[in-house]
Amino acid sequence: ITQGNFDLKELDIYAVGKKGKDALQRAGCKISLDCSDICEEPTYADAAALGRRVLTSFAQGEVGEIWLAYTSFINTVVHEPRLIRLLPVSKEDVDEKVEREGSAGLKLQMNFEAEEESILEMLIPKYMISMIYGGLLEAAASENGARMQAMDSATGNAEEMLEDLTLLYNRARQGAI
């Protein structure tokens, strides 16, 4: 967020996670909502509540765009920061995603008879909530991976220190004999 083309003073940030919130505050961002309590064990209900709040702000014109920033889980060692625009959806964003992920093998399976507007009114909230929930889960997985890596490193360091201390103890004991 701090490296993007954003006016940090104009952002309404709904922060999930203490470290991210603290870093954004240090960078001069205004935190509109602190949701740090949901980051440990995120639930779909938490994502739905946050999604509804964000959508209400968007629908009332309080915000012009909605972006989701989160840590993407690649594996236990690698985590990548991601920033994606959720709303408004642009044709360029869709084309880029289709190009990146491919559309081979996709075929039309049904025709919609409902009005486009009513379909979008139903789908956009579900899309928003699922993207927020996915971001929460990926961030939680990334944090757990980082914790596992840190514990593994600490265990290795402790074992190495124990070997060194055992060697020193044995040398001192041999010297005393």
Give the ranges of each region predicted by the language model:
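C-terminal beta-strand-loop-alpha-helix "lid" module of Rossmann-like NAD(P)-dependent dehydrogenases
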Residues: 1-177
